[in-house]
């Protein structure tokens, strides 16, 4: 029996396990996981622990940056809307929004023109709409991603 048998740790990826803010802002490559984090995760798993990542990213977005991240548990994607088994290449559980969400969001957008939203599709396809977000009294241009215009 290992020291961590029966223990599950699920870590966020962006800016928790790996500092990605700079890469996301610049469009550059996401840095690799630090040696210290990798060693700690590998030790935890070697001692019987189950390690997973829980991220807000969609499947294609996380798959593109997960190389080098040691995991022996399923991955939580879409801010908890899906659990994915990378070795098996399949979803274990999903709670995706129904297709009618497009109509509902379109109606809300007509009723509330300033509404800002972000909706990811399973294949990571998105269209772009420009909105203005007010943060601390300052108008900031923001890109709002949606699947509305498919």
Question: Positions of the model-derived regions?
Answer:
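Asp-based phosphoryl-transfer active-site loop
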Residues: 5-27, 53
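Glycine-rich phosphate-binding loop signature in dinucleotide/nucleotide-binding domains
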Residues: 2-3, 111
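A short, polar/charged loop-to-alpha-helix boundary motif
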Residues: 25-36
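Residue-level recognition of short loop/turn positions
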Residues: 1, 14, 87-88
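Active-site phosphate-binding/coordination module
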Residues: 34-138
């Amino acid at each position: 029996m290992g020291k961590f048998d029966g223990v599950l740790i699920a870590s966020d990826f962006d800016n928790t396990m790996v500092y990605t803010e700079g890469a996301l802002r610049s469009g550059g490559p996401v840095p690799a996981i630090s040696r210290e984090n990798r060693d700690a995760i590998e030790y935890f798993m070697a001692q019987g622990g189950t390690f997973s990542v829980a991220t807000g990213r969609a499947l294609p977005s996380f798959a593109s940056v997960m190389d080098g991240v040691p995991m022996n548990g399923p991955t939580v994607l879409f801010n908890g809307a899906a659990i994915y088994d990378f070795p098996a290449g399949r979803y274990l559980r999903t709670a995706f929004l129904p297709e009618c969400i497009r109509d509902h969001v379109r109606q809300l957008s007509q009723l509330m023109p300033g509404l800002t939203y972000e909706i990811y599709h399973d294949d990571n396809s998105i269209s772009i709409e420009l909105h203005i977000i007010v943060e601390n009294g300052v108008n900031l241009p923001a890109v709002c991603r949606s699947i509305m215009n498919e």
